[in-house]
């Protein structure tokens, strides 16, 4: 994957299940184009689906199977954890949000699609945050 391949944050995957058709359509289009996510994104998605959306693990597993076929899922490594500490300290994001940003940098992405961070902000001079909505 190249720097042009975006990293996708958890809410984008959750919008696939949203009643907000506008956001669901945007999320579907982004997934269709491909992207990179981390295991953290899968974990957050699973947690929200089971706890807030009351989905069964069978239903969740079915969706995750499709996500795993469409997106490049990256493992988390100690170096990502270390980078996340730096990002949290420098930019003031929560540690778990910083893990998303660090995973994107580690994957070589130059772009992260999310609505949870400051759109237009550059992180460590190599990652641009973009709100696709």
Provide a role label for each language-model segment:
Residues 8-9, 38-39, 93-94, 116, ...:
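Histidine- and aromatic-rich ligand-binding microenvironments
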Residues 1-38, 52-62:
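Short, well-structured N-terminal submotif of metal-dependent ribonuclease cores
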Residues 1-2, 102-133:
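Acidic, PIN/NYN-like endoribonuclease modules and their adjacent C-terminal/linker elements
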Residues 39-47:
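Short, conserved active-site loops that position catalytic residues or coordinate cofactors/metal ions
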Residues 12-13, 41, 80, 100, ...:
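Alpha-helix capping/helix-boundary segments
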Residues 72-115:
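Active-site neighborhoods of divalent-metal-dependent phosphate/nucleic-acid chemistry enzymes
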